[in-house]
Amino acid sequence: MSEKINQIVEELKTLTLLEASELVAAIEETFGVDASASTGGGVVMAVAPAAAEEVEEKTEFTVMLDEVPADKKIAVLKVVRTLTGLGLKEAKELVESTPKMVQEGLGKDAAEDAKKQIEDAGGKVSLT
């Protein structure tokens, strides 16, 4: 924008509601336009709800085991076995080959609970 436009915008920001209303009336009279017939505001209102609808809360989560410190492998292994029902060998392979998916298709609460259990045991977890 030009400097002149920027100055006008800054000046408009300082107007009270009454002054802004008077300004609109003066512009309507001077230029022979009707601000109430403007469709610009309607378009903005129509777009805003559509954008809000696109932001849906995720309902299914995948628990990813990102990293396990060497001194925490046994504790994390026990938690992974409890969460997944895997055997000792399978759970050990999962823990030693991070990053790996631990569980998928979980609800938010279940995923948060699994994440907390693994983190409490010393593992680093992410939810996707």
Curated annotation (Swiss-Prot):
UniProt keywords, alphabetically: Chloroplast, Plastid, Ribonucleoprotein, Ribosomal protein
Pfam hit, one: Ribosomal_L12_N
GO biological process: translation
InterPro entries: Ribosomal_bL12, Ribosomal_bL12_C, Ribosomal_bL12_C/ClpS-like, Ribosomal_bL12_oligo, Ribosomal_bL12_oligo_N_sf
Record keyword Kinase present: no
Chief localization: plastid
Single GO term (MF): structural constituent of ribosome
Localization in the cell: Plastid, Chloroplast
Sections of the chain in a coiled coil: none
Region (Disordered): 103-128
GO cellular component, one term: cytosolic large ribosomal subunit
Bias type Basic and acidic residues, positions: 106-122
Quaternary structure and interacting proteins, as annotated: Homodimer. Part of the ribosomal stalk of the 50S ribosomal subunit. Forms a multimeric L10(L12)X complex, where L10 forms an elongated spine to which 2 to 4 L12 dimers bind in a sequential fashion. Binds GTP-bound translation factors.
Record HAMAP family: Ribosomal_bL12
Job of this protein: Forms part of the ribosomal stalk which helps the ribosome interact with GTP-bound translation factors. Is thus essential for accurate translation.
Record family assignment: Belongs to the bacterial ribosomal protein bL12 family.
PANTHER family: 39S RIBOSOMAL PROTEIN L12, LARGE RIBOSOMAL SUBUNIT PROTEIN BL12M
Protein name: Large ribosomal subunit protein bL12c
Source species: Thalassiosira pseudonana
